[in-house]
Amino acid sequence: GGVDLVKIANQRARAEATLDALFLVTTTNPIDLFDFTKAKGGAAINITSIVRGPDGLPYILDGNTGAVYRVNPTDGRAKMIYQPGFDLYGARTGKPLIITAAGPDILIFDASANLWRWRPANKEGQGTLVKLRVRDAETWGADIRTITGYAVDFETGLYRLYVVDPSAKQILRYEPAPDGTGYPAA
């Protein structure tokens, strides 16, 4: 008794195809973009965050070393764009807690409450790391979980900065300085 399994399979296939078309479902297969075990000589890497950068490439945060890498799947390379303990313009890079993309930049928030901006200079992965001045950033709680930016002016690359500060129970908004060097006012 019952319905023939072949008939059920045929009806299911027709229904799935119709539902996939209706809900814009696409079947995909995963691909390996980069093998960090080969690149680092087998050292353990702990990917704790990944964002799509302004150049469309993935940027990952290694929770073990604190390094941030730009991964280029076309040439099979991962270029380190940030590492803790580097002295730059009178400040030292700390262990990154958050990476995010904003406008033309990758933003890196470190454990010392510093906000760093890495901006790509070319398609080969060269770029510039600069510490951003953010008014009252030292008062942010240790529990900052989200930082993001939304474009103010696409042509200049300026963006408003938003910071979710759970301990203050606030979402903080900062307007960019006209020269793009930081966020002097909330």
Where are each of the predicted segments found?
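Amphipathic, non-membrane alpha-helical rod segments
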Residues: G1-K7, V51-G53, Y59-N72
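Alpha-helical linker/edge segments of TPR/alpha-solenoid repeat scaffolds
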Residues: A13-A43
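A short beta-strand motif characteristic of beta-propeller blades
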Residues: P30-G41, R77-G90, G127-W140, P184-A186
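Structural signature of eukaryotic scaffold interfaces centered on beta-propeller domains
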Residues: N46-P54, K95-A102, R145-G157
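Conserved beta-propeller blade signature
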Residues: V51, L57-I60, D105-I108, W116, ...
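Short loop/turn segments immediately following the C-termini of beta-strands
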Residues: G63, A111-S112, P120, P166-S167, ...
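Short loop/turn segments immediately following beta-strands, especially the blade-tip
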Residues: D75, R119-Q126, Y174-P184
